[in-house]
Amino acid sequence: MFTNWRIFAVNRQKTFSVHIHTTCYCKIKANLKRSKTQVPLTRSYSSPPGIVGNEVKSLHSIINPPVAKIRNIGIMAHIDAGKTTTTERILYYSGYTRSLGDVDDGDTVTDFMAQERERGITIQSAAVTLDWKGYRVNLIDTPGHVDFTLEVERCLRVLDGAVAVFDASAGVEAQTLTVWRQADKHKIPRICFLNKMDKTGASFNYAVESIREKLKAKPLILQLPIGEARTFQGVVDVVNREKLIWNSDSDDGKDFERKPLSEASDPTLLKETVEARNSLIEQVADLDDEFADLVLGEFSEDFDLVPAEKLQAAIHRVTLAQAAVPVLCGSALKNKGVQPLLDAVTTYLPSPEEREHGFLQWYKGDLCALAFKVLHDKQRGPLVFLRIYSGTLTPQSAVHNVNRNCTERMSRLLLPFADQHVEIPSLTAGNIALTVGLKQTATGDTIVSSKSSALAAARRAGKGERKPGRISEAESVLLAGVEIPEPVFFCTIEPPSAAKQPDLDHALEHLQREDPSLKVKLDPDSGQTVLCGMGELHIEIIHDRIKREYGLETYLGPLQVAYRETILNSVRATDTLDRVLGDKRHFARAELEVRPAEEPCGVATIEYADSVGEDMLQAPREDIENAIHSACLQGPLLGSPIQDVAVTLHSLMIHPGTSTTMVTACISRCVQKALKKADKQVLEPLMSLEVTVSREYLSPVLADLAQRRGNIQEIQTRQDNKVVLGFVPLAEIMGYSTVLRTLTSGSATFALELSTYQAMSPQDQRTLLSQRSGLARVL
């Protein structure tokens, strides 16, 4: 059966972050690579993988291992903490590559996009399937840039566990906090890997303390480093009281020695380990009642007698309950500590059956899967990543998309191995699959075996009754999709000629399916296409992909900030629409009120006055509310979306025979009339900012931020550096990378994340409106 497997290659894409290293590592790496012999990025698959590029070993495990032996995990961290390097080492030690990929050399397996290999960053999360000591591990390497936060959100939605990678010299950094919060939201158990223990300034104790203080987590120290920075040579296994020393003569780190600690040879290290183990036992006993009963009953006199397997089982339960996080350490770049990390993944992180999914009881074993990522391949069309929660997927079978109420036929079923894919005959619950043939499916869609299966699940859930505005009964069994953040930047994009506009539209359509955080709009005034994205890097990567993958040399307009608008007072308005079309009269009159919402809200909240009965609402409520929301997409000042607004419909008169289109047009005009009469306010995106800078450059950095309307909240000390925390308007921080590099001689880094939208001062608002010349733009 295995001889019939086939390998395919696809191009892929990702999402981003505004964390910028002012040392311009991407340019340094690009220059270094220019001096080397260039290796083509694309691989030939006329022969089995392993013949060209990174050699890949065929999967030897069974196609569908027991669910208890599956681990769906993600690698998450701040940029440059070593996520991709750690992943490459995992692939190598598990036997799926025969050479070590390196980010600096641009030959990694999971960073397979041209932009990733040139920049030395991860943009798009690459899924990799591998085996380790009888376990199937589905591994996803995620980006650390804030511009690509959606990519992290996508993979966390379908994971059962995660590995958080930290730079041991920096501890918890800005993006670490972001991805940690995302993991908390999805209740994902995780373990921590303190990477770069060989780096100058690495401090195990500092990193552990930052996890405790900044993440408010309870670290369980499972390993101790043997040496730090240049003296780092291995780790101590606290649970088993053993030391692991990597052979200095081994270049690839495969050879290491595991020895029990003894009083004779390691008295000091043994003492530290015993103390750490006793402390670990006490910590776990406080968090796990079963283990506490065992320790107090059988081993109260001597903790040394507590069996390692009992302690490991308790740590597994504590990790699953998210009461604490196991902490390990090593250096992926120096090939030390990665094999024990893989052991910890299989020992402490949960299997799919250990995660609670309440909706599974509705399906009774029928197929239920979530589409969490869509890619586009020029030969095979859309490629959809699915997490299978229940049932079995088979190729050449029809499946039902609950969100889009359509049935599609899946032609092929693949196991993902970065840009290499292995075709398989079936895949069961707990696995991550890649499918070919689902042309309508988008990110966040729920996939079931048939429409009748979805309706049966809805009835079991007790929510099968039709409700006003409900599209279908099956909506009650939709899985929670992936939250799409609002873009903060936009710019126009033009093709090289009008004849190429259809080609550009085609490219943008594909890119939007792959990356839902990319929004494409049409400016009604100029007719230009507008790109809306998560940051400067996001827009830059999209522009680059259009050129590389679709052969279009497009032109970008100036990058602009995506503002919002709101109102400051309550206003009533009335609008009448009276038209004769053919021999039919269409008449509608609406009266409504707009006012500031009591609570912040991204979209308008809609209410109906008591005088508006169901008999007056001859048009469906859904159409009425869509008209109100549509009217709030373009504010009267800048054409920006309106937020923090409440709308109350007071009356609606409709002549018999009036079309729904005329009614909604009347309501939409009435909302716009009310918004124009109200006192208006522009809201600007406010970013949370973290700047890491050496002491000597702190003063000029603070002075520069003050000129940018920055609000400094705190200045922390991190090793020999200062960390400036604060808020700054996004409009003031554009191009900050170049300025900071100049101020600090390229030694500082900074990270940005959208915090909220704040009201602009009257003077700043007047300046902005003057710059925009009063012309509205579609965001």
From Swiss-Prot:
Where on the tree of life does the source sit, at the highest rank? Answer: Eukaryota
Q: Which GO terms describe its cellular component?
A: mitochondrion
Q: According to the UniProt record, what class of enzyme is this?
A: hydrolase
Q: Which InterPro entries match?
A: EF-G-like_DII, EFG2, EFG_II, EFG_III, EFG_III/V, EFG_V, EFG_V-like, G_TR_CS
The record's section on Pfam families has: EF-G_D2 (PF22042), EFG_C (PF00679), EFG_III (PF14492), EFG_IV (PF03764), GTP_EFTU (PF00009)
For this UniProt record, the keywords arranged alphabetically read as follows: GTP-binding, Hydrolase, Mitochondrion, Nucleotide-binding, Protein biosynthesis
Task: Please give the chief subcellular localization of this protein.
Answer: mitochondrion
Location of the protein in the cell: Mitochondrion
In terms of SMART domains, this protein maps to: EFG_C (SM00838), EFG_IV (SM00889)
Please indicate if the UniProt record lists Acetylation as a keyword: no
GO function terms (MF aspect)? GTP binding; GTPase activity
Residue positions annotated to bind GTP are 77-84, 141-145, 195-198
| Enzyme Commission code(s) on record | 3.6.5.-
Q: Which residues form the tr-type G domain?
A: 68-353
The answer to whether the entry has keyword Transferase is no
Family indicated by similarity: Belongs to the TRAFAC class translation factor GTPase superfamily. Classic translation factor GTPase family. EF-G/EF-2 subfamily.
The remark listed among the other comments is:
This protein may be expected to contain an N-terminal transit peptide but none has been predicted.
Main function: Mitochondrial GTPase that mediates the disassembly of ribosomes from messenger RNA at the termination of mitochondrial protein biosynthesis. Acts in collaboration with MRRF. GTP hydrolysis follows the ribosome disassembly and probably occurs on the ribosome large subunit. Not involved in the GTP-dependent ribosomal translocation step during translation elongation.
Q: What is this protein called?
A: Ribosome-releasing factor 2, mitochondrial
Give the species this sequence originates from.
Rattus norvegicus
Q: Gene name?
A: Gfm2
